[in-house]
Amino acid sequence: MELTDLLLAAMLLAVARLTLSSPVAPACDPRLLNKLLRDSHLLHSRLSQCPDVDPLSIPVLLPAVDFSLGEWKTQTEQSKAQDILGAVSLLLEGVMAARGQLEPSCLSSLLGQLSGQVRLLLGALQGLLGTQLPLQGRTTAHKDPNALFLSLQQLLRGKVRFLLLVEGPTLCVRRTLPTTAVPSSTSQLLTLNKFPNRTSGLLETNFSVTARTAGPGLLSRLQGFRVKITPGQLNQTSRSPVQISGYLNRTHGPVNGTHGLFAGTSLQTLEASDISPGAFNKGSLAFNLQGGLPPSPSLAPDGHTPFPPSPALPTTHGSPPQLHPLFPDPSTTMPNSTAPHPVTMYPHPRNLSQET
């Protein structure tokens, strides 16, 4: 391995050490500029040790490295960045073109090390300024190899130095600012879990109840009354979605259990064909849509059930048996949980069940 390759590897390792030891960009570290100035001066001093340094056979184009502070202040930040990136890129092309004209020699080895320093500077500037389109500035043609080394030193002492010292702090702060991703839209989904629990977990899953009337009664005109409650709707709201007199009037325990009493005037049949297993909560709290009525017992004081048991229908598709509780006749005597004797219930005084 040649000495040039070893020096290039050493410079790359030095840049990597600067990058790892400092959280900022390499161009924001002042040690990088000092290192490049020191190395370029040392490399140029070694050129005098090479014997027989002849001029180049073909002149190479180098950037104009003269610097004017007044002209520099009038330029915008973007034009300054393009000017410096263009100058460093053009210098790298000139060094590579000059090295391509030479046979392996002392000068060729020094030009290889010089190209490594220029690449290091170009990479650091691109990391700070970005890969902008270089601005084609003024150029000069040179045959003297010393002009290659002097061009790098003048760039470092002039435009690059002023850029890093004057514009550098602002660019470094702008580059190191954390980029916080702000969501473009906020979800407007309102979950029912945020509402206070007013029904004590009575109903928590989907259920549907279908009521059909077969004869004259209070609800004879309602041929297909259907109630659908979404998951957790009754569990998280403060009032019941269905507040109709005569429906699920005095339930005690789960609706799909055996203790529920459905009080109606002339409603004959209540089909619960759409009740899925586990649709109702297994608690024993009363689901009272007409507040003020005490829960009715399942057995009368005399030991007889107030209503005949409901016939069970055959199940289909492996579903649980569906209950069809019958509504009692309005003249049926029902026990009262507080009174010692049964109390007779009568239909509502308003007769809305006349057939038209």
UniProtKB/Swiss-Prot annotation:
Ordered alphabetically, the record's keywords are: Cytokine, Disulfide bond, Glycoprotein, Hormone, Secreted, Signal
Instruction: Please report any disulfide bonds recorded for this protein chain, giving both cysteine positions.
Output: C28-C172, C50-C106
> What's the superkingdom here?
Eukaryota
Secretion signal: which residues?
1-21
How is this protein named in the record? Thrombopoietin
Gene behind the chain: Thpo
Job description of the protein: Lineage-specific cytokine affecting the proliferation and maturation of megakaryocytes from their committed progenitor cells. It acts at a late stage of megakaryocyte development. It may be the major physiological regulator of circulating platelets.
Recorded source organism is: Mus musculus
For the biological process aspect of GO, one term held by this record is: positive regulation of protein phosphorylation
Q: Which family does it belong to?
A: Belongs to the EPO/TPO family.
Entry's free-text remark on domains: Two-domain structure with an erythropoietin-like N-terminal and a Ser/Pro/Thr-rich C-terminal.
GO cellular component terms given for this protein? extracellular space
Entry-linked PROSITE patterns = EPO_TPO
